[in-house]
Amino acid sequence: MRKLFYWAFAFSLCVLMGCKDDGVRVEVVRYAINEPVFMSISEFRNSVKVTDEVVPITKRGKICFYKDYLYISSPDKGIHIVDNRNPASPRIAGFVELIGNEDLSIKDDKLYADSYVDLVWFDISDPERPELEGRVENAFRYALPTIENGYGFDYNMCYSEEARAKGVVVGWEPKEREETIYHYPSYGDDLMANDAASGTSTQGVNGSMARFSIYGKYLYTVEQNIMCVFDLSGDKPVLTTNDIWLQRGVETLFNYKDKMFMGTPTGMLIYSLEDPLAPKYRSSVSHVFGCDPVVVEDDLAYVTVHSGNTCGQNTNELMLIDVSDVDQPNLLVTYGMKCPKGLGIDNGTLFLCDEGLKVFNTKDPMTLMANQLVHYAGMEGYDVIPFKNTLMMIADDGLYQYDYSNLQGCFTRA
């Protein structure tokens, strides 16, 4: 369940031009594109493995905290299990090998996670020995591996009937291609003959980057602009509705009261969960094209927009939005940032991943910058979970933790 983008031409582009006697201009275009690497369905669905071996945390991912244990996704590879009963000395307790994982959520000793096209779930009543209980096959039809090289991908090679018969896409192989494009004078220079690359329960606490969210007995998942709702009240999750089409591609989910706040590349959406099976659009706040998570406390939403991402813009901001009237949210103030990412809030204290970790007192939203409590640099923070005076932060180089019981004193890294 990851964002993918379609570019007609990738970074590596070479154009050779010529002209025929009839005035048709000919271009030979060379470009780089990702072609899919497949794994058979049987191999894919039999690849889950739980190990107590210590697997180092080498890549940032989504995080979920539950009953003194922290679960950290290693994107596309699996889930780290961290014993956090002593935050001053966390212990890596195991690893779940789960190909294609990115998101996770927990309720009533059940861990729900994506595995490319499938939704899988584990019994974690013994947190250090998760047991695979089942999977909802093909729950996420458009899931593909993360693209890191900046090239586009061949849509037909991934989604055609022939492609689906090959199995599941689990990786990418960059290829160089050459295509001929004809420009006809009567139709203008923008006409192309070919499209080069179109192509009463206990519940875990998620970070702000999550695209899984639990409300009551339901699990909500988003895949681009499609939402699915699963009923978790029985022995296994049951898909309750057909696809719910959202107004925009959604990147993050955050529940507040009976509302769901969604971060998208172009702004924040607010949906009502009064009918949990039929989320209803209420309003939105737009911003420049960018990536953003959102958290809410005391009817105030905090939204970050950052550059250096697949959203393709250079704006870095923290937006504060009054959502006391969800039908008419009001942007109060915008603060410039360096490159903000995940954030969390607990009882008036805002934790923000920007140039490391910044902490603010939010008593007066209009003077937030004057109420910065502390700034820890030297790491690239990605997302946070504040919980009972312990701030858990996943960064590019691993897990950081801070005791924030005394905000006037120093935090302590675990």
Regions found by a protein language model. Name each.
Residues 9-13, 414:
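Hydrophobic alpha-helical targeting segments used for export or membrane insertion
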Residues 15-18:
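C-terminal motif of bacterial Sec signal peptides marking the signal peptidase cleavage site
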Residues 20-414:
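Feature marking well-ordered beta-strand scaffolds used for ligand recognition
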Residues 2-10:
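Sec-dependent signal peptide recognition
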